[in-house]
Amino acid sequence: MVHHNTQVRLNPADETIQVGVTQIRFLVTGAESNGSAAILELTIPAGARFPALPHSHEAYEETLYGLEGISTWTVDGVSIELGPGQALCIPRGAVHGFANHGAVDAKTLTTVSPAEIGPEFFREMAAVIDAAAGGPPDRSKMVEIMRRYGLTSAPPPSV
């Protein structure tokens, strides 16, 4: 039986989490969507890359829609530039990461379906990154957090 959430409101989650320099604003989480989707707004500052490790996940897809600026997504080794009005679906199992190589901030609307990941993951990752105080974050702690939330860290690139 599907539980119907009777508290219908705009941006029911409305929580912003800072992970390094990247800002993640949750608009809807699995708690508000009965697990069907999480929707978040991702803001990547100019010249920045997301501090989490490239990864994959088998439990959900990520669908991205460009709102502002251009973000660069590397999906299974292929670099894809996502701009305003463009959509990109990252399938389950695809190794991916992202950056903003541009001169202006980039913003995407991201849907995770089903909602297998939420604010808790990003809060924990932010704590590890903040603890590094500008230095490299503890990779083993990051990998452990990722594992607990169903993400598989990609091996580091060969030099």
Report residues per predicted region.
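A short glycine-rich, His/Asp/Glu-containing loop-to-beta-strand
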Residues: 15-54, 60-61
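Short acidic-glycine-tyrosine-enriched beta hairpin
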Residues: 8-10, 17, 77-95
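Short, conserved beta-strand element in jelly-roll/cupin
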Residues: 41-45, 56-74, 111-113
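Basic/polar N-terminal segments that are highly enriched at the extreme N-terminus
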Residues: 1-14, 152, 157-159
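Acidic/histidine-enriched, glycine/proline-rich intrinsically disordered or flexible terminal extensions
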Residues: 123-159
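Structural motif
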Residues: 23, 63, 70-72, 79, ...
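A hydrophobic/aromatic-rich effector-binding and dimerization subdomain
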Residues: 2-5, 111, 115-134
